[in-house]
Amino acid sequence: MADLKSLFVTRLYRAALSDHGPSVNMQELEASCYSIAEDDEAGQDWCEDNGYPGYTSYASLTDLPWRFPIFADIVAALDAHVAAFVEDLEFDLDGGSLKLEDIWINILPEGGAHGSHLHPHSVISGTFYVAMPDGTSALKLEDPRSSRMMAAPTRRKGAREELQVFHRAQPAAGDVLLWESWLRHEVPMNPAEDDRISISFNYSWAHAT
């Protein structure tokens, strides 16, 4: 009988933020996101100049955990989630650890989208979901081998999940998704009337000294 194995696995981590640490007041967090967006004129200007629909603090604010204690609570929980994911991935960090590199807010209104991209200077990337209205878009992940499939036929409709070229993860508010930063991903257009609110972040490798 033939022996078939799945090789070079791509892992996707999903859990409730509260699995590591106390629950976060989601109403307070959502209000904080809107308050920050309203006051962040530099971020608003960046979004307008770069054609980003809605709002992101990615290019304007680097100290959210210092400004708002609720973000510090989120980071404490994320540290534990990332540590659990690193254990699953069996990384050898050579005495070092993964440290939060940056964290930012995303508010996507109806019709907003975030095109395909990756995070080349980080090890682990992820998103914590604050508001996911009914019908909003999923996170779309792409098989990292896609560029090498020049002559490969397409997969049959209904192919097994692990064989599909794209995977759509539909998290709920309060969920954390983690993946390795080289994995290309996007947020398709938000068809929901309400805003899709999330907090994204990167972790980098802090080598032992």
Whereabouts are the PLM-identified features?
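Solvent-exposed residues in well-ordered beta-strands and their adjoining turns
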Residues: 18, 108, 129-131, 202-206
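Catalytic core of non-heme Fe(II) oxygenases with the double-stranded beta-helix
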Residues: 105-176
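A generic structural micro-feature
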Residues: 7, 95-97, 118-122, 191-195
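Hydrophobic beta-strand-centered segment that forms part of the acyl-chain substrate-binding groove
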Residues: 89-110
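Catalytic core of Fe(II)/2-oxoglutarate
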Residues: 158-209
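Short helix-to-loop capping/linker segments positioned immediately adjacent to catalytic or ligand/cofactor-binding
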Residues: 65-69, 89-93, 112-116, 127-128, ...
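Non-heme Fe(II)/2-oxoglutarate
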Residues: 1-92
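Hydrophobic residues positioned within well-ordered beta-strands of beta-sheet architectures
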Residues: 13, 101-103, 124-126, 197-201
